[in-house]
Amino acid sequence: ICIKSWAAREVERVRQAMHEMAAADLIGDVPIELVTGPDEYLFGEEKALLEVIEGNPPLPRTVPPWMEGLFRRPDSPNPTVVNNPETLANVPHILREGAEWFRSIGTEDSPGTMLLTLCGDVRYPGVYELPMGFSLRELIHGIGGGAPEGRTVKAVFPGASSTIVSPEQFDTPMSFDAMKAVGSALGSGAFVVYDDSACIVRATLAFSRFLYVESCAQCPACKHGTGQIAELLERIDRGEGSEVDVDTILARSLTVTDAQRCALPTGETLIAQSAIQVFGAEFVEHYGRPCPRPREIPVPKIVDVDEHGAFVYDDLYRLKQPDWTYADEEDRTT
């Protein structure tokens, strides 16, 4: 079981659950180990996760876990199954209620429920468990309450690694196949909403810089490519960009995935291309002048939920550098 080390409360709860299961003799001879890992984005990538379990930094391998797994050796590849806890959370319900019950929820191709995280410019952000097939419009407006008063929803970013969803696509069912059909992805079910007061160039820059910072630098095309795209987006945001910079971003987005070990640079490609294709007019508005919607748009990195149920964001992430250090360690600890 792998958890980020900063999640102390969650780590302690899992440890307590393990002790309770052992005391009740529910584990048997199956060894269960808890591994705490770094805060890096790539800790969630399955090949990098195996490296962390073996005591190494979260650097993705070239071979998937089902071919070479934990503690592999030349004579024993040790294929390993890596599952998200949300997947495993369905198992006891299926065992208790049966597969037919499970398939009665959701859609034929994507049965069951999913935890969907909704944040950004909505009245009621939160984490909601909903049946697969629920539309994005129902999530944003029916459950999330829509945009703040006087505003309209402009775009939705499905996490940090997929095509931006425009309002015309909000009726798409939230299932893996349906989201893929419109050129996006359901991913981990995280949706960041931006209303018409937000600048798409600046939002794209925030996500692009996040991917640049979190790139492990094993693949030069990824590290240099995400860095160049982020630099060009920042130039455009300052009002110093031009059509040439947009064309360069599009060209670089085609090569950033060369020899990739993981899907991180694919996320850069999808976000950059969709932002320019769908919101190209906003890029043009920046040519020769500063951002016409000068609103701060930080990376929406959620670290907790407060006593009122509101998300708590990592305010120090702005200090994180591409080598995974922080620009000002004193600020980080105060």
Predicted regions and their residues:
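Hydrophobic alpha-helical positions that pack around
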Residues: 11-132, 322, 327-329
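Small-residue-enriched alpha-helical segments and adjacent helix-cap loops
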Residues: 1-43, 48, 151-171, 176-177, ...
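Short amphipathic, charge-patterned alpha-helical segments
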Residues: 132-148
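Local cysteine-cluster metal-coordination motifs and their immediate loop/turn environment
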Residues: 41, 154-163, 184, 209-231, ...
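Generic beta-strand/beta-sheet core signal
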Residues: 2-4, 35, 119-121, 130-131, ...
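Gly/Pro-rich active-site capping loops and adjacent beta-alpha segments
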Residues: 59, 64-92, 176, 182-215, ...
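Immediate flanking context of iron-sulfur cluster ligation sites
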Residues: 145-155, 197-218, 235-264, 281-289, ...
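Intrinsic disorder at enzyme termini
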Residues: 64-65, 74-75, 81-87, 152, ...
